[in-house]
Amino acid sequence: MRHRRGCRKAGAKTTKFKPGDSFYAHLNVHNLGGYAQYAVASEVEAASKPKSISFIEAAGVPAVALTAWQALIDTAKLSAGQTVLIHGGSGGVGSFAIQIAKARGAKVIATASTANQDLLKQLGTDVAIDYTKQKFEDIAKDVDVVLDSVGKDTLARSYNVVKKGGFIVTLVARIDQAELDKHDIQGASLRTEPNSSELAEIGKLIDEKKIRVIVSHAFPLSEAIKAQEQVATGHTRGKIVLKVADEPK
């Protein structure tokens, strides 16, 4: 939940940005500071804001889009023609993961509740699974990659649908090495890292209309607690952001 208005002051060694530039950033986990009107970001954490979207929309991109990118592209090495199963496809990470996978030329199977089946299809999902009515393992078989943002029983059942030599990435739990060995697959637990070049690539896809940003609600900074409570429900559609200032004119 970060709203980046732009560069207010640049450090002496800063070469990429100058005061007045518009950028977005994923702050290092050791610094954070996004719940504020002003924050400090290094050049390796920031990239120019996509021109085709608002600042509110831009705030909903860095953390979740980088997570999806680093899970699918950097970690699982997803390539054209492969099949990926994305759990929680209507959420922040999931909605970006679907579109990144499609831009990569992959076939996408995604899970979501009944209310979000329409969104899965709008985002380009090839096979949409309603987890309230269907077991994903009855539909998704021998997939190349699984992206898990749910954990628990969903993760435990996901090992069974990955083909030999495939990859499973979880964002919320530890990978079970015994299960990886049993199914002869690879796996990893992911922690997202700041990456300005990947943010720039994501921004390019957004401006090319290959990625659509979904922001379900923008809370004022004074209602940060309400925003956190909404996130904690685990049923957020797209991204929730904090608005810390009016859009620049």
Name each model feature, range by range.
Residues 24, 129, 144-147, 169:
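N-terminal Rossmann-like NAD(P) cofactor-binding module of classical short-chain dehydrogenase/reductase
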Residues 24-25, 40, 85, 169:
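Hydrophobic beta-strand signal
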Residues 30-43:
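A structural motif shared across PLP-dependent enzymes of the aminotransferase-like
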